[in-house]
């Protein structure tokens, strides 16, 4: 489904128009970073991309972050199909992951079932409904409710959360 159609159905025609006109908050933030969103991209299943990120996590947070950056740029800016094995495996190779191992991981029904379970848990326990999603807590106060929010946020949001946690 085209992203504009998806946005109109989920958030209403104003969200779709904002995405088309590139005047929305997210587009403005992205433009400051030299990123232009492809408003012709297609919405599709993200389970395999989540499985690939899961695979990358076994090589450490830095490798995982490198991969996520490649995936985000490919999908949001270049309009690559996030459910395409071709795109996902190119991204894996780009960050130095083994293509055959990555393919085996993303095509594994057991891995997909586990990752779907983790996604469902994130939705039910933390209200995760999109990316990016942030959960910030003070580990020295484990009984205190963590802060959880989705979407692009200005630096002031993070500063405010960190100040409240200290």
Predicted feature descriptions by range:
Residues 54-166:
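C-terminal cap of thioredoxin/glutaredoxin-like
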